[in-house]
């Protein structure tokens, strides 16, 4: 049964018990956020007795996507736009009976680990640069782009003599981001020791992707010759924010006009434990089978790597106290 967006009004007068419910979800801009999640459409279908749910995130083409079903508690599937259109048109011609089979596999004993690399400095203070190493599908943007920037920074700073590196640089490919950000959660839980001497943390995640647009005349996704703007985050003083924004501007790193309320992505688990900086963007290609190298511009990788290197160089001229955020004015402004 087709229920459109899956709002309460879409379900009015419809008996979905024992049926496959089809939901059309609007991308905002894609899998990272879409209307079915915002309005609990899958959960609503399950509560009203649906046997299964299939929804389409309306990205033109036939994208495979990875997205959570929410709290539907019934078998839930995603369909590409072409497949959903074919099924809907078949329903328009008459009743359609479907046979649904969900095949899953459980694997035991799998392990992952954060991998560390260290460039010693001349003091006991350090800067942590991180990038998660797990991905869905091909993972070019998410997160080979971040990994490449981190490795580029490691290569660049390795060519600077240790005697000229004020602070130790610790590089870490964090584990289990798509399973609860286990690597950064560990850093948060062990911050009293693992981050005791850390003056800055930088997260490299989804840093470069081709800007795309929905065509105004047809259901087509069109690539541009530009790079998507990035969401950004700074936990620290006004001086640190000025350094970060100045570095991004110097190297042409496009960003949103205002800062995020928190560091989304892998850094979220530890975003306020130490002064921190992040760029991240979750485009229409995010968590889809179209997240391939072709949509990751080299120029964007280079710009972000140069920006982060500039931030590190400037931070290394300052004491940690200069980088710290102001203390909360009252308990109401403290982190929950």
Q: Which residues does each predicted region cover?
A:
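Soluble metallo-hydrolase cores and metallopeptidase-like ectodomains found primarily
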Residues: 2-13, 68-141, 152-155, 159-160, ...
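Acidic, glycine-rich active-site loops and adjacent beta-strand->loop/helix elements
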Residues: 26-28, 59-60, 133-136, 172-179, ...
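Second-shell loop/turn segments in exported
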Residues: 2, 26-42, 72-77, 102-105, ...
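Structural recognition of the beta-strand scaffold that forms the well-ordered cores
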Residues: 2, 19-24, 51-56, 76-78, ...
């Amino acid at each position: 049964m087709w229920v459109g967006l899956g709002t309460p009004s879409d379900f009015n007068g419809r008996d979905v018990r024992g049926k496959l419910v089809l939901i059309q979800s609007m991308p905002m801009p894609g899998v990272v956020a879409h209307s079915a999640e915002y309005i609990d459409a899958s959960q609503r279908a399950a509560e009203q007795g649906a046997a299964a749910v299939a929804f389409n995130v309306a990205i033109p083409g036939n994208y495979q996507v990875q997205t959570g079903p929410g709290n539907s508690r019934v078998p839930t599937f995603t369909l590409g736009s072409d497949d959903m259109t074919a099924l809907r048109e078949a329903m328009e011609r008459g009743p359609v009976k479907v046979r649904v089979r969900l095949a899953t596999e459980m694997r035991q004993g799998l392990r992952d680990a954060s991998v560390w690399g260290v460039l010693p400095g001349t003091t006991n203070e350090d800067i942590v640069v991180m990038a998660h190493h797990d991905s869905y599908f091909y993972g070019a943007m998410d997160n080979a782009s971040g990994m490449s920037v981190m490795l580029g920074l490691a290569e660049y700073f390795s060519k600077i003599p240790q005697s000229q590196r004020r602070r130790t640089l610790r590089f870490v490919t964090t584990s289990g981001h798509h399973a609860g950000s286990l690597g950064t959660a560990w850093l948060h839980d062990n911050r009293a020791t693992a981050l005791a001497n850390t003056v800055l943390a930088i997260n490299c995640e989804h840093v470069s992707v081709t800007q795309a647009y929905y065509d105004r005349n047809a259901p087509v996704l069109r690539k541009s010759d530009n790079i998507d703007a990035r969401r950004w985050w700074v936990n620290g003083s006004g001086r640190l924010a000025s350094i970060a924004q100045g570095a991004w501007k110097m190297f042409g790193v496009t960003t949103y006009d205002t800062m995020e309320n928190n560091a989304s992505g892998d850094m979220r688990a530890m975003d306020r434990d130490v002064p921190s900086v992040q760029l991240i963007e979750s485009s229409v290609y995010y968590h889809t089978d179209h997240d391939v190298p072709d949509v990751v511009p080299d120029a964007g990788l280079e710009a972000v790597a140069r920006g982060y290197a500039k931030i590190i160089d400037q931070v290394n001229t300052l004491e940690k106290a200069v980088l710290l955020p102001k203390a909360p004015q009252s308990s109401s402004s403290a982190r929950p």
